[in-house]
Amino acid sequence: MTTLADLRINYSRASLDEADAAPDPFAQFDRWFKEALAAKLPEPNTMTLATVGADGRPSARIVLIKGVDERGFVFFTNYESRKGHDLAVHPQAALLFYWIELERQVRIEGRIEKTSAEESDRYFASRPLGSRIGAWASEQSAVIDSRATLEAREKAVSERYGDNPPRPPHWGGYRLVPDSIEFWQGRPSRLHDRLLYTRDATAAPGWTISRLSP
């Protein structure tokens, strides 16, 4: 019988060298994300979001990235969810993209800020109708007695707002403003390539690049 200790893959698809890396991490992320899209990976926009609650207990979940620019990485959620409460007391978080088919990870750490109401309104209006209704119907992370309760709420919201539900006040965007971004490329014999971008106001591009030992 195969044991967990025997499960392993020898990575060999690509390398990551300082000479080929972009001078700023957003350009490097854009390059890798486009390669993930070109490779037709299933949902390359999924990422793990890790937060810490008031009691110091960490939690993690998969969310979808909805925007990236030089300001940071944007996602949207219910502000009253567990992650919303975590971020209210500890506005620091970590993101992880894992593209196993390309043998790559991107690890991002930084502070969290809410997006503007205008940004949240604009994205909310672009969502499918069912998702907009669902944002009202679901008290995310709260205990409910049955699926029927959720479906009854969905029906009530649909009847109330029809085809034009407004954005709920408890729903909107967050932006992670990174202070470090690590790009990890799997290599043979577990001697992986790891390049860490650290925010540095004294550096010409605003970032320094360091190679980390695997």
Curated annotation (Swiss-Prot):
Its cofactor is FMN. One of its GO terms (biological process) is pyridoxine biosynthetic process. Gene3D superfamilies: Electron Transport, Fmn-binding Protein, Chain A (2.30.110.10). It catalyses: pyridoxamine 5'-phosphate + O2 + H2O = pyridoxal 5'-phosphate + H2O2 + NH4(+); pyridoxine 5'-phosphate + O2 = pyridoxal 5'-phosphate + H2O2. Binds 1 FMN per subunit. Keywords: Flavoprotein, FMN, Oxidoreductase, Pyridoxine biosynthesis. InterPro entries: Pyridox_Oxase, Pyridox_Oxase_CS, Pyridox_Oxase_N, Pyridoxamine_oxidase_dimer_C, Split_barrel_FMN-bd. Its EC number is 1.4.3.5. Homodimer. Catalyzes the oxidation of either pyridoxine 5'-phosphate (PNP) or pyridoxamine 5'-phosphate (PMP) into pyridoxal 5'-phosphate (PLP). Belongs to the pyridoxamine 5'-phosphate oxidase family. PANTHER family: PYRIDOXINE-5'-PHOSPHATE OXIDASE (PTHR10851:SF0), PYRIDOXINE-5-PHOSPHATE OXIDASE (PTHR10851). This is Pyridoxine/pyridoxamine 5'-phosphate oxidase. It comes from Burkholderia orbicola (strain MC0-3). The gene is pdxH.
